[in-house]
A protein has these predicted regions:
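Short, structured helix-loop boundary elements
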Residues: 21-24, 45, 112
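Conserved short strand/loop->alpha-helix "switch" segment adjacent to the catalytic nucleotide/phosphoryl-transfer site
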Residues: 29-53, 104
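Residues in soluble alpha-helical coiled-coils and helical-bundle/repeat scaffolds
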Residues: 22, 39-43, 123
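STAS-typified acidic loop motif
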Residues: 14-26
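Histidine-centered phosphotransfer motif of kinases
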Residues: 47-65
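Conserved beta-strand-loop-beta-strand hairpin that lines the nucleotide-binding pocket
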Residues: 1-14, 60-143
Length: 143
């Protein structure tokens, strides 16, 4: 890819994982390896792995035991779209204005705010039976 910072023109990443906490390590490793294979720079790989980890953790917590999917694709010049989807079980993700912990010391509730801070944009789509959170990541510094 001639030193580019993202996987433009490469095949997309599309995998499904078991809905268990034990699967999170494999998910992070697979995403990291795929991005490095596609010559993404270190900073981009680190951000994408953290975003993946937060979204996959949310998917497992929202639907324990149900598989979740991870997709990554180039989304234009210097952008990568990373999506994690899971079965809709009982509750949908909170509205954007509630993407923070209820108190500063709360043990949970930071995932979507972390994803939002690391992403150019975040979209939550809820279908009849599937929740899909898509993060748009900038792969190169703004010019």
């Amino acid at each position: 890819m001639n030193g580019s910072t993202h996987p433009e023109g490469s095949r997309a990443f599309d995998r499904e994982y078991e809905g268990t906490l034990e699967s999170l390590r494999s998910t992070r490793n697979d995403v990291s390896a795929w991005l490095r294979t596609n010559e993404c720079d270190h900073e981009m790989v680190e951000r994408a792995v953290l975003v993946t980890s937060e979204l996959a953790s949310n998917a497992v917590q929202a639907a324990p035991g149900c598989p979740y999917g991870v997709k990554i694709r180039a989304a234009g010049e210097s952008l990568v779209e990373l999506a994690v989807s899971n079965q809709f079980v009982s509750t949908s993700p909170p509205d954007r204005d509630r993407w923070f912990p209820t108190t500063p010391t709360a043990p949970r509730g930071r995932g979507l705010s972390i994803v939002e801070a690391l992403s150019r944009d975040v979209r939550v789509d809820v279908d009849d039976s599937v929740v899909c959170v898509t993060a748009l990541l900038q792969t190169a510094p703004d010019q």
